[in-house]
Structures are given as structure tokens and as C-alpha cells.
Amino acid sequence: MASRFRLPNGLTVVHEPNHTAPVVAFQLWVKVGSADEAPHEVGLAHLHEHMLFKGTARRGPGAIARSVEAHGGEINAWTSFDQTVYHVVMASRFAHEGLDVLADAVRNSAFDADELTREQEVVCEEIKRSLDMPSRRASKALFAGAYQQHPYGRPVIGFEADVRGHTREKVLSFYRTHYRPSNIVLSAVGDVTEVQVRGWAEALLGGDWGRPELPRHPRALEAPFASVRVALTVDEVKESWLHVAFQGPGVDHPDAPALDVLAMLVGQGDASRLSLEVKRKRALVKDVSAWSWTPKEPGLFAASLVVNQTSVEEAFEATLSVLATMTAAEVEPDELDTVKSLIESEAVYQRETVQGVARKLGSYESTMGGIEREAQYYEAIAQVTPARVREVAQRFITFDRAVVTGLLPAGSTFTEETARAVLKRVASARPAPLPARNVAPSKPIRMVGASGKAKEGLTVEKLPSGATLLVREERHVPLFAIRASVLGGLRAETPANNGVSLLLARTFTRGTAKHEPEQVSHLVDSLAGSLSALSGRGSMSLRAEFLSKHFERGFDLFAEVFNTPAFPEAEVRREQTQQLRELAARDDRPSLVAFELFAKTLFTQHPYRLSLSGEVASVEALTPEVLRAWHARLFDPSQLTLAVVGDVDTKAVLEAADRAFGTSRRKVEALHDVAPEPPITARREARRVLAKAQTHLVLGFPGGRFTDPWLRPLEVMTTLLSGQSGRLFMELRDKRSMAYSVSASSVEGVDPGFFAVTMATSPEKVPAALAGIREELQKLKDVPVPMDELVRAQRYLVGSQQIGLQRNGARAATMALDSLYGMGPERYRRYAEEIEAITPDDVQAVARRILDFDRETVVQVGP
């Protein structure tokens, strides 16, 4: 149960205990965002987010992140229009240290002038990075078009000229005005008591901060939309990104809950009206959604669509027509009940992680009027009726006062005149209601606890079919997760069928022998669950999560999809077309282009050289018959590893699994052997020219297998280089301001994978960036890592594992895949012991094994 108290200096603390896992989350919500900036302060709120981690009187540059990661934690921040949030999550035994670091950063930031100059350069690289992301550019255009007076119209990150022009005096003035106790909320959730939180908060955040109450810069008010606004930009992009928005209410408006219901009905999830009509039935868009954004002040109700290689006008009109139907007729009660249950279930799923609960409490307390508003919100959701949905649709979906913005490819025929004409046509038409949907009714979600005490340990069973079943009871939340994994994925593909695994994953849940595609989507929603398939380099999986009260129905639906997917012709052709369109639009994602070019250059024979998405010729050759054969080859129960984790009864799981997966369907054809990749004997380079703001770099080497004895030292080496206290981050970002992000990663597989460093930087910085990367890698080969740095990396890895395994789905995935790959389902429980046993000599040895510059592969993608 959440509680709240205030310190004498005005700082508010909200706390909720959760002793399920030894993890704690602290978040400091500062009630200032980019919308509070004066014109001469544009970009300062976001710049503060960067600067508060750059040192205090007690902790120099880099020490804040280093201290948190040394105690197994993660620290970061985000800035929005209305608030700036600093957050840490870590092992609860180090909870005091985590809050100490967070409080010191927010209360005592030094704002060193030299550090400010360096961080301004980093933010400018972040701005350039956003220029290479069509989704970011389209979003900025929407807010600029919708808010012509209000500061919501400015990007949170600011503009390069403004960021470079800020002085230390400006930064300090903004800090002293807004970073004061009465303007801050501490949200504390996890394995800590209220007594502990109260004592630490008073010691670390109490007392007089010496910052008097000062007037805030008033926000300009946005006038009501009086007419249609259209702003379209044509540029070198492959896809069309469109938004259509209507003026909406703020978070405290009584219509806000009903608009959330409307948004989910219209455009959230596979069973939403836009998805079914515009994406599935008519195949007009790559993606489409509707959303209600309710910030502190009037927000937006909007629909967003991404169109590739189809008529933008037709897709735009189809989207508007679906919106219009919501104003013309009331939604069916069963459909409404399902959506309301989905919204209510979000509160249950959020309880799986301490950081999720901390974010919810911080948001309610800082922005939404207090933590009590959560109960009021869900009460309002429960009271929404079909008539109420139609009422808010008629009030806010106003085609004569819409804002339309878009980012379009060169040669697009969609113009401002076209957009205005479509709006007029839809507004003047009398839309026919969409056909009634056959939706299974949902019962209201009751916010109850889990069903009882869990059994200790893991149950492992071999079913008669040969399937391996893993069951772990975890009763802290009334949810359960299922993960069914088989060997396959990219490693099983050839150039001729490259992309088959992804297409199978995209169509796996789109209908069964018993249920049509739309029926499967509705059934999942009626159970307030999720069901999806995914494909990786060495395996494929089907995964699901449901409320535990729906165990029998959820498990049966999961088994039905696994055993009898239909792969209908229409669904396969639709997803195949979409996959081909995405291949045609790859150049809009330069980081992906760089990584795929790296794989093709590093691997010359192994399937790892292939794209996870396939190539045009191979994807065009795929048919429903090919998918059915691929499914039959891989997804027989005899090949299956099935993990079930959560609020379940082991006996019931065993019985259900035996019914569903206890019999093998046929004699299974073995996967073909994969020839080993020939050794690399010389440096390899590749370059692709793209007209982008930054150059995307990948520098890498052959890597390891899942089962290699030096895998754990390789993880430690990767961590020493990555993270906010990692060597690459500290040297290339913090000291030299070469990039917004730089990271190292190790991708292992059934066969040897790769180790790589990735970075995006301005083209003129590329030679220095590559030299800097090699310099940091060489140090690991030449000098054993100091013991204190090694311990920090070890604690970070162990803490990150604890944080990452809070969700049932994460534990189910880890158990299933570790078992599938022959490492055992409880390998993750030995993780801390294995990591903590690593020595400096182990790290140096693996660095010398992997980091051979005579065999490096370097890829550049950019101007």
C-alpha cells in the first residue's frame, strides 16, 4: 500500500514497500520541464538532465554513475515538457548508497564550466542524431504545428544554437529557481521500509536548501484551434510519416479517462479498429495508432500512421473514416468491456517491477494531483459507457479544426490541398458504423493479490513427446508467463529462404485451425493478455502473459496457436508485403544498415551473415505452404522447451502441458548442419554512403559461443567498456564529446558470434573516434584492469541481472533459452557466483583473445 509524507522543507515522499525481490527504485521527480523555459532558456531543462550527472562537491565527473554501477545499480534521467526525472534502481542492500548519490546529484550539482562546454557538444550530437530519425522529425513537426503559442511546440531537447549559447550563469539561475524541495517528489518503491525511507530522506534531502521560492516563467496559452492547419515536409525518406491531431484536454479534465478508452478502442493493439480496418483488412499502412496525450495543460487526441509504397491519400482517408465512425455510433458493450479490462489490467502488469510502480506513483503525485488519483482514475474508467465514448468522440474529433503534419518522400503526391480535401470529404460524409465485432465479454479486473504461497524451487518434467517442461511458481503478482522455444531462427536459414523465420513469427498468431485471425486477437484481449512470436539468430519462440485467473483459457489458447497455426493466405501476403516494404525503407535506419553491413562483412559463409529481415528476392519467394512446412519442421512438441513462471499451480500446469504437448505429431527432420565460418586472416572494411547528419560506425571482431568457458570474462570486459561509467563512455563521450552514445556489445550464439563497438558521430570526428575506440580496447590488452574497477563491473552485472529478472516473462525466457541451448534452466541462479569469480587476469586474457586488430572489421555508414 502506498503512503505519502512531507519533509519540513516541503519535499514530498511517496513510498510503497515490495519485498518480493531484493531490489529498490528511487526516483526524484522535479516539477520543471521544457515548457517552463523562457525564450532565452530553450533547451535548459534537458541540459540540466545531462549536467546533474557531471559531478558535485563530493563526487567528480563520472563518479556518480561509477558509484551507482559499483553497487549493482542503474542510474539515468529523462526530461519531458512538464517534469525532469532522475532515477536509480539497484540491489536493496545498497539502497542507502543509491539514494545518497541521487540526492547529491539533484541537490548539490557543481555545474563545472569545462564540463558544461563538453556536455553542450554531446547534446548537439544528440540533436544531430534525431535528424537521422524520421519518427523524431515527424513528432517534432506535429507539436510545432499543434502548439504555435504554447511551449509544448518546442522540442524538449531544444535547438543547437540555443544549447551552444547557454552560459554557466544561465544554468545556475534555472537550477536555483526550479530545483528546490517544494518542487520535488521522491518516489521510493521496493525492498525498503517506510522507516528507512523516512530516515534517509530527512538526512539526505531535508533541511534548508537555500533556494527561496521564485516566480516561474508563465506558460503562454494555446488558443483553441479555429481552423485546419497543415504542414507537410518532403525529404530524403523512404516512408511517409503522418499525424492528424485534435485539441485535447489536460490530465485533470473529467473527459481524460473516457478519451483513454476511445484511444484504445480506435488505435491501440491488434484488435483495435484502425489496426483491423486500415492495416489488416485494407493493408494501407505499415503502422497506425491512436493516442490521447493529457499533460498538465491541454493536450492532443491524435492518430499516427506510417505509409510505405501505398497511396498516402487513401491511407489518410481510411484512418479519418474510422475516427468518424466513433462519432456516428455507439460502441458495442462487449467491445467496450474488453477495452476497459485491458486498461485496468495495466495496473496489475505494472506491479511486476519496482521501477514501474515508482514511475506510476511519481507521475500521479507530481503531475496528476496525488497518488489518490489512481483509484479515482480506474473508477472513472469503470463508469465509461458506450454513450460516453461517443460523446467525447464528438467533442474532440473535429475535422474542421484538425492539425495535419507529415514527413514525405521525394515525389509524393500528397499535398496540403489533398489533406484539406480529404478532411472535408470525411467531415461531410455520414459514416456507416463498422460491422459489429464478435468479442468475448470480459469481466472487470479486481486488484487482488496472488493466489497463495508458492512452492520452493523449479519443477522439470520430460513429457512423453520429448518436450521439456519447466515450471516455477511465483505468487507475488496474479500473473503468469509462458515461453515456448525451439532451435531455429536465422541459423537455420539459407540465402534462398532468408526471412522465413521473421515472416513466420509475424503470422504465427494470425489465426488457427479453429479461430480466424480477428478472433484470436479478440480472445487475447478478452483475457487481458498478450501473445506474440519472435525469431532470433538461433531460436524461435512463442510467448504469452495472462492474468492467473485466466490460466486454463490462456494456456489452451497458447497451445492452440502453437500446434495449429493456419497461416492464412491473406495474412501471409499482407505481412509479406509489409516485410518487403520495410526492406525497401531500411535506409531510414542508418544504425541498422551499419549493423547489417557489419554482419555481411564479418561473416562470409555462416548464416549469421544474413539479415534477420531477409532480402527482397528470398522474401518474395515465401508462400503459406513454405511457412507451414517451416512450422512443422521446427515446432513439433518433441523439439520444445516450455517454461511457465508465475502465479500458477504446478500440478495444473503439468496436466495442461501433457494434454497440449505430450504427443509428437511426426518424425522430425533434423536441422541442417552449419559449416563453421572460416577464420579471419586480415582486416576487413566496408562503407555505405547515405545522406545523413551522422556517420554510424561499427568496429568488431569474431566472438564466442554460449558455452565457451570464457563467456563470463567477456561479459565483464564488455561492461568495463559500456555503461555511463564505462571506459568508452567516459573517454569518448564525457571527455572528448565525440558522440551522444557509444557502446560495446557481445552477441554469442550456438556458433561463434561477435564483439562490437558501435557509435554515431559527426563525419569530421570519424578518424579520431576510431582511434579513440582502438586506444581504449588496447588498454584492456596491455594492462590488467584495477581491482576496484573490476568489482564495480561485477556488481553492476549482478545487480542488472536481478533488476532484469523481476518480470515473470523475463525469467521464463531465460529458463527456456538456457535449457534449449544446453546450459540448464537454473544457470541464471549461478550467475552472481560465476561473475564474482572473474579475475583481472581473466579479463586481460579474453581481451587478448578477442581484440585482434589485425582481424578487425570496420564499417562506416553515412555521408
Language model features: what each stretch is:
Residues 125-126, 130, 220-233, 341-350, ...:
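Short, conserved secondary-structure transition motifs
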Residues 140, 168-204, 401-402, 591, ...:
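Non-catalytic, conformational "gating/processing" segments within enzyme and secreted inhibitor domains
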Residues 1-15, 193-233, 375-485, 649-688, ...:
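Proteolytic maturation boundary segments
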Residues 14-16, 21-47, 61-105, 136-161, ...:
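M16 family metallopeptidases and their MPP-like homologs
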Residues 270-271, 721-725:
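Short Ser/Thr-interspersed hydrophobic loop/turn segments at strand-loop and sheet-helix junctions
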